[in-house]
């Protein structure tokens, strides 16, 4: 309490269960992150609280993680990435960043994003059948569990594995791929020597992933693909600019006061100590 705004990160969930009573003076919540699935936006809207975040802040970091992972996998198979076709599922900030990097080194790719095709006349999404002919699939979708284009268990509900697939990468959100499906698939074809490799940075059961899946993954990481120093700075500055705009204030470095906090602690009380007081026009920043 005592703040007009909260600046949070993805480790802090805001919904009726975690925060059953929101302070009356709270008017803005900003998340220094690209994703928003940790925030119940309808709950905030119902309480008259505006929400904003930093879309695309870690796109380059994630794209570099994915490209490096692809090259590492190719090296392990004594193959070359230019001899593989990559299917990019989700052509938002990260998907586009990855596409540019692949194009720069001569790798063929196909981008799948029907919702984007509806929004932007200049973009054409590939067909699902095209993805079945790709050697590598990289997922860059937001987590959506309802509506016209849900992404929950996109694989296998919308796209199933095909004989052409060799590598599956998910550095987007846990739950987009049904993890049991990957394990069952590899169990069924274990004797044929055609197991699919997978690289996972996100998990259905975060923060504790399935140990069997971790052991079988070619690369397994704890949701850190976007954790570059530059990405964190961009995330922080992006959400702070939006916060200041909400309160009709201009961005100046003199308004920043840095406060060191333990980013590993998942307590809303401590996260809420990072806030904005419009009476003093001061930001207390702990997200850098």
What residue spans do the PLM features occupy?
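Rossmann-like dinucleotide-binding domain for NAD(H)/NADP(H)
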Residues: 165-288
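Rossmann-like adenosine-cofactor binding region
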Residues: 14-18, 116-211
């Amino acid at each position: 309490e005592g703040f007009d705004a909260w600046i949070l990160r993805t480790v802090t969930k805001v919904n009726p269960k975690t925060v059953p009573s929101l302070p009356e003076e709270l008017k803005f919540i900003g998340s220094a992150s690209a994703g928003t699935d940790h925030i119940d936006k309808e709950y905030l809207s119902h309480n008259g609280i505006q929400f904003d975040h930093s879309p695309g802040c870690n796109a380059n970091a994630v794209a570099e993680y994915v490209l490096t992972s692809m090259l590492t996998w190719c090296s392990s198979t004594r193959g070359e990435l230019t001899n593989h076709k990559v299917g990019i599922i989700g052509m938002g900030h990260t998907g586009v960043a990855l596409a540019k990097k692949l194009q720069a080194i001569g790798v063929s790719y196909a981008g799948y994003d029907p919702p984007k095709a509806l929004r932007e006349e200049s973009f054409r999404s590939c067909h699902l059948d095209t993805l079945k002919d790709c050697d590598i699939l990289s997922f860059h979708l937001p987590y959506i569990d309802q509506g016209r284009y849900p992404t929950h268990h996109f694989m296998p509900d919308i796209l199933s594995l095909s004989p052409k697939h060799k590598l599956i990468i998910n550095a987007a959100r846990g739950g987009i791929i049904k993890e049991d499906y990957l394990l069952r698939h590899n169990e069924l074809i274990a004797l044929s020597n055609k197991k699919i490799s997978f690289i996972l940075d996100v998990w259905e059961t975060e923060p504790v992933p399935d140990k069997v899946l971790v052991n079988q993954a070619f690369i397994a990481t704890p949701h850190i693909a976007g954790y570059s120093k530059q990405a964190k700075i961009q995330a922080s500055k992006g959400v702070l600019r939006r916060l200041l705009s909400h309160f009709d204030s201009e961005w100046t470095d003199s308004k920043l006061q840095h406060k060191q906090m333990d980013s590993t602690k998942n307590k809303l009380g401590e996260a809420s100590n990072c806030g904005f007081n419009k009476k003093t026009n001061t930001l207390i920043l702990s997200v850098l």
